[in-house]
Amino acid sequence: MTQQSLEPRTVADDAGDKSRVPAGRSWLDRYFHISGRGSTVAREVRGGVTTFMAMAYILLLNPLILSGEDAAGNTLGQKALITATAFAAALSTLLMGFVGKVPLALAAGLSVSGVLASQVAPEMTWAQAMGMCVMYGVIIMLLVVTGLREMIMNAIPLPLKHAITMGIGLFVALIGFHKAGFVHQGKSTPVTLGPAGELAGWPVLLFAATLLAIFMLQARGIPGAILLGIVGGTLPAVLLNALDVIDPGQWASGAPELHGGAVSMPDFSVFGQVEFGGWGDVGAMTVGMIVFTLVLAGFFDAMATIIGVGTEAELADARGRMPGLSKALFIDGAGGAIGGVSGASGQTVFVESATGVGEGARTGLSSVVTGLFFAACLFFTPLTAIVPGEVAAAALVVIGAMMMMNARHVDWSDRATAIPVFLTVVIMPFTYSITAGVAAGVIAYVAIKTARGKVREIGAFMWALTVIFVVYFALNPIESWLGVR
């Protein structure tokens, strides 16, 4: 779609007070500066609906990732997780619309959810894990207020930023393959295809068919490919289950059938289930690394996404500054705390916001529309819960593949870049630890730069990270040597 040529309306400070709005416009126009940004109410509504359709899959994927047990063996209910995911996305996106006044939508970040499920919950209770999420959100907000967020962003080498995104992509894809039953732990090998070296059962075949269908839709450039693929995979699943073709026990998350009506009251049972105590059992070093990993997981993509979508909407100037940038970054950080209190994990800006911009969205009104759609989903939990876990898992693999596309930005001919990137990317899924991947990449980057005599290119922040990560890897031997373990 050809976009209109719009000059930037303001500088980096907050949204739109200086936008030129003709007299006689409606309060809606005046508040969101719709005319001032060359848009219309119809375009904003269309953009908001498009953005929702592009990211509605999160209502299925986030509960799937957070479905595991915590250290006490407790799990979070699927209906409660769907409610929490919809509520947190609605509140965060509405805040971005009404306060930030920019066309950005937020929802649970799969990278943050992956850290919570794989590294945090196994060490503590889910309530304590959500407390960690709140802490991560508060830290992000403090970094924005103090101006340190941008400083830290600039201190991390760009190749490592891409590597972290790629590594999390592989990590998320592995979760998807495992949830679908496509990959199992083998008896004589770490992993194997299916439970015995082969695919078994209709559900896993439905996963494979859904995965291919989404990839084909994306290759054709079909809008909302992920959501369409999920719907397309769910319909035959419901039919096969209704015809008793599949044993209900084969479905990983229960048979795809509607229990009761399509409409129900939201389940807020996990809302407010947050604890900030009891972290001493896992150790201060572990707590610090977990919080640091959560910050990393939700840190890097947000600013790039905000600036990227702002540029696409022609709101950013030549220096990448855009109306409402400071508020948008702060709300993105607040999303971490909102997600933790809601029980949905940290909220972050979704790159799918660009789909709404492509339909003409230029203001926060489109975000309000998207947020209202998420709010409406609170009352349609049964329809969301009917989607089989195997079908939703296909979307996880697709998201992982999309994150891996950052590989095109890496200079693979430069070993000083390629080796740290490689270690970051592969160690995350191989160790099932995002922290370990980041640590390996940082240490390798500093070591190789030092070996090449380019110490000045490293920077104080990277040196500090290297020391922290060396201690992280050597913590067990150090504790044994000191006799404290």
Regions found by a protein language model. Give the residues of each.
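Helix-loop-helix hairpins and the membrane-proximal interhelical loops
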Residues: 3-6, 10-80, 191-196, 230-326, ...
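Hydrophobic, aromatic-rich alpha-helical transmembrane segments
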Residues: 37-48, 74, 78-82, 86, ...
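Residue-level signature of catalytic and energy-coupling elements of molecular machines
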Residues: 45, 65, 152, 224, ...
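Helix-loop-helix junctions within the multi-pass membrane cores of secondary transporters/permeases
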Residues: 25-62, 88-89, 108-165, 309-407
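Hydrophobic alpha-helical transmembrane segments
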Residues: 22-34, 77-85, 104-114, 225, ...
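Hydrophobic/aromatic residues within the transmembrane alpha-helices of Major Facilitator Superfamily
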Residues: 49-56, 91-94, 98, 173, ...
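Juxtamembrane transmembrane-helix boundary signature
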Residues: 88-109
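Membrane-embedded alpha-helical modules
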Residues: 122-235, 239, 368-485
